[in-house]
Amino acid sequence: MAESIERMLPNDINAEAAVLSAMMIDNNSVAKVLELVRENHFYKNSHKVIFRAISDLFERNIEVDIITLIHRLEEKSELEKIGGKLYIN
């Protein structure tokens, strides 16, 4: 009898957080990351939401920082879904 083996995709939550942090700290890194990384590359759902918000700010030519990111997430009613302001900080 063949057993079904569920395999998790390789992921590193800390690496995901580091990429998002770099995007919030250095606006020059946003364009570079967006060239290489897509939302579906993130494993953690909250990281997907944050990445999408950062991408949206960048596309609108709004400087990405913690304040603008929190504001954007609040506008989209997604801040609490990702863990609130404490998770962003």
Which residues fall in each region the model found?
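Noncatalytic partner-interaction/assembly domains of nucleic-acid and motor enzyme complexes
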Residues: 1-89
